[in-house]
Amino acid sequence: MLTIALSKGRILDDTLPLLAAAGIVPSENPDKSRKLIIPTSLPDVRLLIVRATDVPTYVEHGAADLGVAGKDVLMEYGGQGLYEPLDLRIANCKLMTAGAIGAAEPKGRLRVATKFVNVAKRYYAEQGRQVDVIKLYGSMELAPLVGLADKIIDVVDTGNTLRANGLEPQELIATISSRLVVNKASMKMQHARIQALIDTLRDAVEARHRH
């Protein structure tokens, strides 16, 4: 049995056509179903529906053999028990710093609000900046407006939400897309099966971008 961990939303919607190219079609619509384990058209493949931030945990610990996760989630997670064999080139966006439009660069210690705490600490440590990182779970744009933080680090798509709240994107930390991740033990134990799936998905990704 191959178990693939996916999260609902944009990543799921973009991943399903790629899985379909490998003959893997869920038995019911994961967006509408309340089930968290969904059988597929292949008797030896099932889907697990989990939170986006939990995908790497399920895969690293072997509860899922494979998963699809955004590079932002993988950068924050930083686990060791995963292979990342394929960039699926879906759910593209940017991980950026942002601050109030026209605001001067703060002197001294920087206060940064983000849900990407590990990414923020690494990014500013590499620059030699002293920072206080404040963990938030949502509505990052509010933090600079009410004096909670000087800057935020967040995923940016169009930047419209930032600008609507008086903020502007500033420094690019990473270009983000969704990646296929594989449990290291599963790759050893089911190598031929998983490698065949990786190759089929790679072909589907390339075919999608040829059009």
Swiss-Prot record:
Its main location: cytoplasm. Pathway: Amino-acid biosynthesis; L-histidine biosynthesis; L-histidine from 5-phospho-alpha-D-ribose 1-diphosphate: step 1/9. Transmembrane segments: none annotated. Keywords: Amino-acid biosynthesis, ATP-binding, Cytoplasm, Glycosyltransferase, Histidine biosynthesis, Nucleotide-binding, Transferase. GO terms for biological process: L-histidine biosynthetic process. GO terms for cellular component: cytoplasm. One of its GO terms (molecular function) is ATP binding. The keyword tRNA-binding does not apply. It is found in: Cytoplasm. It catalyses: 1-(5-phospho-beta-D-ribosyl)-ATP + diphosphate = 5-phospho-alpha-D-ribose 1-diphosphate + ATP. Its EC number is 2.4.2.17. It holds the Pfam family HisG. Lacks the C-terminal regulatory region which is replaced by HisZ. Catalyzes the condensation of ATP and 5-phosphoribose 1-diphosphate to form N'-(5'-phosphoribosyl)-ATP (PR-ATP). Has a crucial role in the pathway because the rate of histidine biosynthesis seems to be controlled primarily by regulation of HisG enzymatic activity. Belongs to the ATP phosphoribosyltransferase family. Short subfamily. NCBIfam families: hisG. Heteromultimer composed of HisG and HisZ subunits. This is ATP phosphoribosyltransferase. The gene is hisG.
